[in-house]
Each structure stands twice: as structure tokens, then as C-alpha cells.
């Protein structure tokens, strides 16, 4: 069986909602890391790419009509290279990576690009068509995040809790204290700022030039979301679901814009194109959980991928766990028997600080983990995420 290797990975900075990247179309944003991959690897015959797989969650606006292939064409990849867009909600970018690796291991592909994109700032409003000629009270939905066009049967069967509500459910069911959530949020911010200062995050970012109506273009070269805070400031924030709730804007991930791309190949193809393998994709697994507590999804997904690969959690030198909400992050750690402040977890900050552009986040976790393994000399990394409507996804990679 062939092995799938990550040979290069790059992302844009992650922009705040309405921030520096908000003027960039989603398809153009998706093309930026692809273009960077091409520039960084001049010896590759890009027509040899079997497929481009990109995760994207919204797909209701400028990311419509298969944004993976649109981005491929916009980036300048040969038109012979196909592309497909994957939607497993928040796990989309990670699913794209795992699916690409599976194709290589199966011998059906030799050179693949995987990644993801999300422009939450540019998510459109949508409305359904009238069911009759004189229909009244049309609904309008903001597609930025969450439910739209709700199926009443689904609502009756499982409920349609908003994402912050699912986090409150997790906090209640698993007794996750408010102070513990705020401590995780503060740690995420502090680690992210330290990683920015040390240059650790800069290794994985390609700068984005934003044209201005007047004057020179603005160059964005770092994530916009990290911010200074303290436990005292975090404790003053009110709950977003209810005033006495524990989930706040301070201990939840951001609404963000960004894109990420990863180049994968088997060993022979990497050598043929002058590429250096950096990490082997060992395996991927997904799992389902009740939608009302979707945030615990990484726990069973992690257990499945470890069973699949024959590895143990103790062997993981780096753990990249998406911080959709601190409540769910802590619940997952405790379900896996880990401490809230395990030093292996998100050593460069997590989504609370760096942001969570949905379709891109999974690819970002794998990119960050690959670089961290090489900085520290670690062998294995676990990357895992929760997924809306009740799923989890996990990938294990090995440094080479």
C-alpha cells in the first residue's frame, strides 16, 4: 500500500469578521494558498495533480459552483486538474485532507491538493422561493453560521439548538465550570500571542495583499483575531445564550475568514517532483454524537482513529483540538482522560484566539501540527474537531 505524505502546507492569515480579508471574495481567497503552493514548489508538474479537494461550509454565495475547482482555475492550475468541494461542516477541511490521503493510499491518486476556505464576512442572506403566487411573510436567513431552512421533522426528533446552545448543553451535562472555560480561553490567547512573537505562526502563513481604493495596498501577514485579555475581563462577560450562562464571546471561537492548502504525494511521486515529505497521514476517523452536544464529537472520533492506527493517546506529542467553545474543548479533554491544561494541546493557541473560518480550520490544524512536530522533534500529532449536527473527526499524522 502506498503511503500519503504531506509535502507542503500554507494558509492565509485568518481575518476577523468584517476585518482585513472581508473585501476578498471567497473563491479568490481560496486561490491564494494554492498560488502560494505553486510558487513554493517550482519543480512540480502541476498537470500531474489528480484532484483538488477543498472543504467549504457555506456555499451559498461567492463560494458556490464548486469553489475547489473555481479556486484551482483562479490560481492558475492547469484546466485539466479537476476539483471537488467537500462539506462536513466544521470538519470539511480535515475531511478533504483525509480523503486525499485515502486516495493516495488506495493507489487511485499520486499527487493531491487538499484544504479549505471560508469567508464568513461575505456569507449572504438567502430566502426561500414562495410556495404559492400570493405567499406572505417570506423568511430571510443569515447564512454566516447555524441553521437555515429548518426541517420540522429534524426539529422534533433532535432539536435545532444553535451552536452556543449546544455548548451550554455540554457545559451543563459535563459540569464544565465557567472559570475553567475562561482559563482555557486565556491560555489560548496567551499562546497565540507568544507564537506570533516567536514566528511560529508566520511559518504557515502567506501574506495577503488587499488593494485599497486610495493609496497603496495593505498587506495582511498575521491573524487578526488574537487579543489581549485577562481572567478578570473574561469573567465580566455575560453569557451569549442566557445572562447567567457560562458560554461567552470571550470563551468561544471567532467568526472568521481564511483559506488553507496542503500538498500531498506518495513517496515516489514526491521524489519525482522534487518534494520533501514532512509528515505521513497515518489515518482518519469520524464519529456521530447527539446533535444537542455536538461539541463532544472529538472524543469518540479520537478513540476510533487511535483504534484504527493501533496507537495510544500517550504517544501523541502534539494535540490540535479545535476550540469551537472552551466548554466543549474541556469536555473532550476530560472524556479522553486528559488535564484541562495538558501542554500538548494547542501549543500555539487554538480557535478561540486564532479564529475558526469553518471550511479552512481542519486543514489549519493539520498544517500547524506538522510544523510543530518539526520544531519540537515530536513523532505523532492528533488533530481533531467537533462538527455541527453531531459529529467528530480526527486525523493522526507522523513526522518524517
Which ranges hold each PLM region?
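N-terminal extracellular/periplasmic Venus flytrap/periplasmic-binding protein-like
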Residues: 11, 23, 27-32, 43, ...
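Condensing-enzyme catalytic core mediating Claisen C-C bond formation in acyl metabolism
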Residues: 1-24, 145, 231-296, 300, ...
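Conserved active-site "lid/cap" helical segment
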Residues: 1-71, 75, 82, 166-178, ...
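Conserved catalytic cysteine-centered active-site region
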Residues: 24, 56-111, 144-147, 157-163, ...
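Active-site-proximal alpha-helical scaffold in enzymes
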Residues: 86-118, 171-200, 261-268, 333-334, ...
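Flexible glycine-/small-residue-enriched beta->alpha junction loops
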Residues: 105, 111-169
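Active-site pocket-lining segment
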Residues: 54, 168, 204, 212, ...
Amino acid at each position: 500500500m502506498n503511503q500519503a505524505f504531506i509535502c507542503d502546507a500554507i494558509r492565509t492569515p485568518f481575518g476577523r469578521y468584517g476585518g482585513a480579508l472581508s473585501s476578498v471574495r471567497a473563491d479568490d481567497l481560496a486561490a491564494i494558498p494554492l498560488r502560494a503552493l505553486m510558487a513554493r514548489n517550482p519543480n512540480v508538474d502541476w498537470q500531474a495533480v489528480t484532484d483538488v479537494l477543498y472543504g467549504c461550509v457555506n456555499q451559498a454565495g461567492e463560494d458556490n459552483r464548486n469553489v475547489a475547482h473555481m479556486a484551482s482555475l483562479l490560481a492558475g492550475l492547469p484546466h485539466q486538474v479537476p476539483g471537488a468541494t467537500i462539506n462536513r461542516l466544521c470538519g470539511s477541511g480535515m475531511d478533504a485532507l483525509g480523503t486525499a490521503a485515502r486516495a493516495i493510499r488506495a493507489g487511485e491518486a499520486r499527487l493531491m491538493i487538499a484544504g479549505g476556505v471560508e469567508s464568513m464576512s461575505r456569507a449572504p442572506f438567502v430566502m426561500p422561493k414562495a410556495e404559492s403566487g400570493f405567499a406572505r411573510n417570506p423568511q430571510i436567513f443569515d447564512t454566516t453560521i447555524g441553521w437555515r431552512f429548518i426541517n420540522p421533522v429534524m426539529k422534533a426528533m433532535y432539536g435545532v439548538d444553535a451552536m452556543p446552545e449546544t455548548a451550554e448543553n455540554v457545559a451543563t451535562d459535563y459540569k464544565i465550570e465557567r472559570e475553567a472555560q475562561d482559563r482555557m480561553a486565556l491560555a489560548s490567547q496567551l499562546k497565540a500571542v507568544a507564537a506570533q512573537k516567536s514566528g511560529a505562526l508566520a511559518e504557515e502563513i502567506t501574506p495577503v495583499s488587499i488593494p485599497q481604493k486610495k493609496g497603496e495596498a495593505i498587506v495582511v501577514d498575521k491573524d487578526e483575531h488574537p487579543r489581549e485579555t485577562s481572567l478578570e475581563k473574561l469573567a465580566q462577560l455575560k453569557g451569549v445564550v442566557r445572562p447567567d450562562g457560562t458560554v461567552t464571546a470571550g470563551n468561544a471561537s471567532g467568526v472568521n475568514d481564511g483559506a488553507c492548502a496542503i500538498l500531498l504525494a506518495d513517496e515516489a511521486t514526491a521524489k519525482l517532483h522534487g518534494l520533501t515529505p514532512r509528515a505521513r497521514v497515518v489515518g482518519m476517523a469520524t464519529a456521530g454524537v447527539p446533535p444537542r452536544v455536538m461539541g463532544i464529537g472529538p472524543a469518540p472520533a479520537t478513540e476510533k482513529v487511535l483504534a484504527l492506527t493501533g496507537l495510544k493517546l500517550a504517544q501523541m506529542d502534539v494535540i490540535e483540538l479545535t476550540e469551537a467553545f472552551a466548554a466543549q474543548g474541556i469536555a473532550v479533554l476530560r472524556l479522553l482522560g486528559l488535564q484541562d491544561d495538558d501542554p500538548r494541546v494547542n501549543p500555539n493557541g487554538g480557535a478561540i484566539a486564532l479564529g475558526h473560518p469553518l471550511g479552512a480550520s481542519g486543514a489549519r490544524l493539520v498544517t500547524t501540527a506538522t510544523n510543530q512536530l518539526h520544531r519540537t522533534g515530536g513523532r505523532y500529532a492528533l488533530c481533531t474537531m467537533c462538527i455541527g449536527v453531531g459529529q467528530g473527526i480526527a486525523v493522526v499524522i507522523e513526522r518524517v
